[in-house]
């Protein structure tokens, strides 16, 4: 048996004590109790905050959403296959942040701001929290500048202003995304940055939208945030908040941004899934009690803010500029039921809605907007002067036409005035049709609406209205470019009206279509 030397033992112990690294950092740790469907229940973490990031073994993160007496319920961000019962986890003291800034323009990112388009890393200089409090009443400014969508039906009847929230609502396959994509394409050259948030869609659908935006040169001013159907519910729930934070960066620097949430029904479904898995009490349609707050706190962040607010946030770097974030949330209805829980919630939060109908879409009227139900509550004060002046008769003509068309089915003999109204309404309906990816300028809309109001379409066959419009716009852009530029600037006067009348008279007399 080997003899142990007491001095050697004491020397080894002394070395071990000297080499012992003692960390004084206090960490709030817990133990994973269960892992089910992306929801992790944790024992411990006594001082965790609501919404705080929790780090699990293997570099996986989660967010604390349920704070109970004995445990914490957290939702995992991304893949949770490596998380197992008995593993330890710790608080990070941080809330979830995403990258923001100009560097994101032209890129496709996930709900955490990671690039998913294969174009390399995004070198964003700043990050910001995804959950922020909306600007207060004093920080806001009234909506009085337009966002031109480029669709005649929308810009004439339901104008949208910078800082407004305008809901696009309709059944599946009624052209909701088409309206939103046209809005993005039309912002090219206006300085308005666009954020398109795709929630719960097929990856192929998102790729198709991105391809169309690239074809029309609109990706340069657009950020696409995608949480597809294959992504976890947590990502689909967070994506709109991430997109909103990216848009707020531009708003808070005195710039203008437009954000599209496509669509918030899927976000509500994802939130319902998370809430039920967290064992929160279900309410109407099994949604949790705070699903209204989910959408209201998101949509209230879209606003027009005054110059003082911008100056304060930029520490005096940007002076005398107001900023805005305009939101176009999309809601998908089931069989036209706008009285369901989520549609009624979002209708009450937003400043108006564009209602798209299946029957109109199937009848070939696209965009399939129902002019009677669609409304813009604040956009009227933001409408361009020339469009506001000319478009008053359009909504009335369409509303009367639909009423008379329904009535005339039961009447055999109609008087001349009613017949004239029906014919005019039919022509206006035809005139409001517009091909996808072909937005019109203010001047082009003004010419078309003026022609309808002043009776230039009376002797044009309904089937020829589209050809008439194309020929008229081609003629005006080539022969009266100065007049078109003046109207594109938004101005309108008796002199311009006289020039328009003269140009249209000449067109009717000399041109063919």
UniProtKB/Swiss-Prot annotation:
Membrane topology: Peripheral membrane protein
Gene coding for it: atpA
HAMAP family in UniProt: ATP_synth_alpha_bact
Keyword Zinc-finger included in the entry's annotation: no
Assigned EC number: 7.1.2.2
One GO term describing the cellular component: plasma membrane
Any Pfam family hit: ATP-synt_ab_N
Compartments in which it is found: Cell inner membrane
First-listed, main subcellular location of the protein, grouped into a coarse class: membrane
Oligomer status and interactors: F-type ATPases have 2 components, CF(1) - the catalytic core - and CF(0) - the membrane proton channel. CF(1) has five subunits: alpha(3), beta(3), gamma(1), delta(1), epsilon(1). CF(0) has three main subunits: a(1), b(2) and c(9-12). The alpha and beta chains form an alternating ring which encloses part of the gamma chain. CF(1) is attached to CF(0) by a central stalk formed by the gamma and epsilon chains, while a peripheral stalk is formed by the delta and b chains.
Name assigned to this protein: ATP synthase subunit alpha
Source organism phylogeny: Bacteria, Pseudomonadati, Pseudomonadota, Gammaproteobacteria, Cellvibrionales
Cited function: Produces ATP from ADP in the presence of a proton gradient across the membrane. The alpha chain is a regulatory subunit.
Catalysis: reaction(s): ATP + H2O + 4 H(+)(in) = ADP + phosphate + 5 H(+)(out)
Molecular-function GO term, any one: ATP binding
